[in-house]
Amino acid sequence: LDALGTTVATYGGQNIGAKKLDRISKGMRTCVAFGLIYSVIAFFLIKYLGPTLLSLFIGAEEKSVLADAQYFIMHWVAFCAPLTFVYVFRFMIQGLGFSKLAVFAGVFEMLARGLISLFWIPAAGFEAVCFASPVAWIAADVFLVPAYLWVRKKLHREFGVTAD
């Protein structure tokens, strides 16, 4: 997913330089589609191969550790779709020249993680730990999606192009 983000940043920068705004939206849709496909594949791979892969690092005698690790990674991989949006939208915003705006997504993630660590983890324990990253990604998305739409609208106005 990180590679998708890097790709979309370069792609966005090149197309804004070439004044081809229509290609930016197409590239976004393509990268999001790839990310969502990856998310589904990763989910099923971890669901069925996760215990085997974890056993490469955790001894078979550590049954409770293996169970907790599988539980944790299943929560993580189940939320790869929101993580796709974090990478694609954040990096596209940066590639389009709005780096300062993209930083705020990190602020949203940090605030979510801080609130989770202060309030949810003490109340729910390991269950909350498993959801900490996914909730942080969703918090970033709550900022990033409208931010991208704002950037897109601003660029269309600047270039005198109707929105696609």
Residue ranges, per PLM feature:
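Hydrophobic, well-ordered secondary-structure elements that form the walls
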Residues: 17, 24, 53, 69, ...
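Small-residue-rich hydrophobic transmembrane alpha-helices
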Residues: 1-44, 48-50, 83-97, 101-105
